[in-house]
Amino acid sequence: MSTMTVLRLMLETLTSRLHAAISRVCEADMTPLAETGELLRIMQIMQREAIGSEHDREGDKDAKRRRLRRLREKIARLREHNEHPVGNSHEAAYQANARIKTDDVALAMIDDALKGL
């Protein structure tokens, strides 16, 4: 499977989670909007990586591994930064938890892809 295919599958998974979060916004509770924003943030990072992977050769597992590890490092740095909420309100804590949860999902997907290489 090419790097582009792996990243595309990850984006499709995140897109389905995004769709589910948006459909929950119609409820009285608007908190899924935070999750929606976080999913979009991670999807944008993955999309940039997918654009860069278009020139990778089809069978080049080393390039795929390097690209996925670099992506994992970026998201891990973001997750570490998100562990420190800005502000003392409940909303700040909720935002930080939403970011961490989304980062953890992305990291797990990347780890699964790396195990398959």
Regions found by a protein language model. Name each.
Residues E35-E38, A63, Y94-M109, A113:
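Alpha-helical oligomerization interfaces
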Residues I22-A34, D56-E58, E83-Q95:
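Charged, low-complexity interaction regions
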